[in-house]
Amino acid sequence: MDNRPIGFLDSGVGGLTVVRELMRQLPHEEIVYIGDSARAPYGPRPAEQIREYTWQLVNFLLTKDVKMIVIACNTATAVVWEEIKAQLDIPVLGVILPGASAAIKSSQGGKIGVIGTPMTVQSDIYRKKIHDLDPDLQVESLACPKFAPLVESGALSTSVTKKVVYETLRPLVGKVDSLILGCTHYPLLRPIIQNVMGPKVQLIDSGAECVRDISVLLNYFEINRGRDAGPLHHRFYTTASSQSFAQIGEEWLEKEIHVEHVEL
């Protein structure tokens, strides 16, 4: 038993899609979240800069005495997860392998699509992980550089957003039976993405799949929070506007949250 919180980091608000799933599946666990919205999106940035920024977020979470860190950002997972996992003495999870595994299970025709930031797609990490598990599957990857900025701006269902999503995803329509949402921002656009891709395409939320792995590790290391540990005190931090973060966060999590601005 370990009553310390679980730490989450992301380039912005996208990681809240993972937090929402954790609140649903593991409602007794406490959360500390840091979103680097001031420097979002990470996708177009060079790998070394992503590495530097991600380590800053990790070190911030370590000051909060977290028992586990979840890199709730596909771009950061692709660039630096292995390094962070090797250097810390607490469990560190990324969101890519769970998403790849879930896509393999859900694919009926062996044609998997991956959408993500330019860096995630350029790294080719989803294709590599999928082919490690099943080399016979076809994988089509597509960079969607405009999606995360739309989510960060709060434009989740405007006509402009619908047009951007349609025009961006058009090359994949009719070509895949499963689609990995390879950025934790993208589930906030899920209804629009599903509408464009069609009802038969299975959308895979890599962040939500990650929560199953969180549960497994909590049990394996015996670090679940005690049921009688007292009231939860979730803490949310952002490097940008706390008001903007709270507005998106409360809409997505369907509860009031307190958000604090921090400088890194």
Curated annotation (Swiss-Prot):
It catalyses: L-glutamate = D-glutamate. It is an enzyme of class 5 (isomerase). This is Glutamate racemase. Gene3D superfamilies: 3.40.50.1860. The keyword Isomerase applies. The keyword Cell wall biogenesis/degradation applies. Pfam families: Asp_Glu_race. It comes from Streptococcus pneumoniae serotype 19F (strain G54). Its EC number is 5.1.1.3.
